């Protein structure tokens, strides 16, 4: 079972990496998010491949895909859908919005208002939408890939803590190195994106997600996760530590990373390598530190420093 899963995962990684040139670790994190039934927040400067990654992942799966461009005038109904009165039947009929897709690209999510941002909360957490006293289930698998520009860019609204906590991982792509950028200039990534065909079906994705949940986690590693999140709650550098949801996210992501590496069990390195992308966006840095440095980078550094102080299980 695990070897068959590994073959499917390798196929998916290879397909996506063709479009996102020179960023295999970023691709791996995106696949980890998918396997862990999580959502991905991709933050970076414009033009480094955030949207390309989302498109490549969606095109690699034989599932429905919708892109939502978040703007200042976007309304919750533009995302969730609306109930329309049918004159023939005398009843209201629900018309689903673009959120009712397997893979949803929420492009530049921090360019819309907090009210519209918060309309995603129920969908991301419970895989359902409640409107007009009715509950509508979302398709499975369901994954939101949200992109955002750094907050110093004009016209952005910071995501509230409740929204950030719904994202399994937050990643940055970064600039390509010289050789990879030359390949991009030659059109390598764009050509590959156009040619991408689905390599996994919806059933194969949900099977992989079920297999991920069966990856074994020793008791000592549960204690390790608890020690890490506990350290964030006690740190004098932070005003808000990691929630139980964050601890669960780190555990699920670690199980997915183990499966991606071809293992049926989690090792401490899985947890260590995912602690920053799984936890840093969930903490709040004290205001005096935010003034001294960018709060996002500072949060990464604080979580990493706390990690170094915690004994690793043997």
Regions of interest found by a model, annotated:
Residues 2-3, 234-314:
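C-terminal engagement/docking regions of AAA+ P-loop ATPases
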Residues 4-48:
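Pre-Walker A (pre-P-loop) alpha-helix and adjacent loop at the N terminus of AAA/AAA+ ATPase modules
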Residues 29-32, 85-105, 134:
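Conserved alpha-helical scaffold flanking the Walker A/P-loop in AAA+ ATPase domains
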Residues 31-71:
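Walker A/P-loop
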Residues 44, 107-108, 119:
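Walker B catalytic acidic pair
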Residues 45, 79, 147:
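P-loop (Walker A) phosphate-binding loop of NTP-binding proteins
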Residues 60-88:
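AAA+/P-loop NTPase substrate/partner-engagement loops
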Residues 86-91, 112-116, 124-215, 255-257:
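Canonical AAA+ ATPase core
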């Amino acid at each position: 079972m695990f070897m068959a899963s590994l073959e499917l995962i390798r196929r998916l990684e290879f397909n996506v990496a063709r479009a996102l040139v020179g960023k295999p670790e970023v691709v791996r994190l995106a696949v980890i998010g998918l396997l862990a039934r999580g959502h991905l927040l991709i933050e970076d400067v414009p033009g480094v491949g955030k949207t390309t990654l989302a498109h490549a992942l969606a095109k690699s799966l034989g599932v429905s895909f919708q892109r939502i461009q978040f703007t200042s005038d976007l309304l919750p109904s533009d995302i969730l859908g609306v109930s329309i009165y049918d004159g023939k039947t005398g009843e209201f009929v629900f018309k689903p919005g673009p959120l009712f897709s397997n893979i949803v690209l929420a492009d530049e999510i921090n360019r819309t208002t907090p009210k519209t941002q918060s309309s995603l909360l129920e969908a991301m957490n419970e895989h359902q939408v409640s409107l007009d006293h009715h509950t509508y289930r979302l398709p499975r698998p369901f994954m939101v890939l949200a992109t955002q520009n750094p907050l110093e860019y004009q016209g952005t609204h910071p995501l509230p803590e409740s929204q950030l906590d719904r994202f399994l991982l937050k990643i940055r792509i970064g600039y390509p190195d010289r050789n990879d950028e030359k390949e991009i200039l030659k059109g390598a990534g764009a050509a590959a994106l156009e040619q991408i065909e689905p390599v996994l079906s919806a059933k194969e994705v949900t099977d992989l997600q079920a297999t991920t949940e069966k990856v074994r986690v020793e008791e000592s590693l549960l204690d390790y996760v608890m020690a890490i999140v506990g350290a964030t709650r006690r740190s004098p550098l932070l005003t808000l530590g990691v929630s139980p949801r964050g601890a669960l996210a780190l555990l699920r992501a670690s199980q997915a990373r183990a499966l991606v590496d071809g293992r049926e069990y989690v090792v401490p390195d899985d947890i260590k390598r995912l602690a920053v992308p799984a936890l840093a966006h969930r903490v709040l840095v004290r205001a005096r530190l935010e003034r001294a440095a960018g709060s996002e980078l500072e949060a990464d550094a604080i979580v990493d420093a706390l990690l170094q102080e915690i004994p690793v299980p043997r």
